[in-house]
């Protein structure tokens, strides 16, 4: 038996309130694979044979994979005024520090306000999102150097392909935080192979410095 323990209020929340039909799609996937799940969960204790949740639920286990909350690097956490208590850097729409204008932060290092949930849920930062953030930050840095005014940044989207055994789930949302103009959730083996092809393409262009490619 497989049990999934999550701090999310529902499956497919992903820290962004869900996207389109992600809730239904994830619930269907779990039911089809006979995976039980525990929502709004907080772990109170772990023993070699058992995991106990704060609500008193005890889950027997022979093997467990536990993912602790993310936190920033020590350099940020130990530098007063640079990051928040978790070690992430607060930034504006151009990914410029809200207090120190010569500091920029993108991707996992920057802070995104979380959704309001019963149990805190972190906001994901995918590689695709990080590339978009970096481009916005680079344009803003160039504007700072040349003394020009930065253009309003575009909304960033989120694109994720989640592997699911012999298939995969393609998820897209624009902008990445609600309210969104467009969402798309599709499942199929084509999504798995699309992810494999993209990985080879992405590594090819990065290793050769061809970052101008889409």
Can you describe what each PLM-predicted range is?
Residues 1-90:
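A Rossmann-like FAD-binding core segment of flavoenzymes
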Residues 9-17, 42-43, 159, 200-214:
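N-terminal FAD-binding dinucleotide-binding subdomain shared by FAD-dependent oxidases/monooxygenases
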Residues 11, 112, 168:
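Flexible, glycine-rich phosphate/dinucleotide-binding loops
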Residues 37-38, 103-105, 161:
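Conserved beta-strand scaffold positions in the cores of enzyme catalytic domains, especially
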Residues 58-63, 67-131:
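FAD-site-proximal beta/loop scaffold in flavoenzymes
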Residues 128-155:
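Internal hydrophobic alpha-helix adjacent to the cofactor/substrate pocket in enzyme cavities
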Residues 152-171:
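Flavin (FAD/FMN) cofactor-binding core of flavoprotein oxidoreductases
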Residues 170-214:
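C-terminal auxiliary extensions adjacent to catalytic cores
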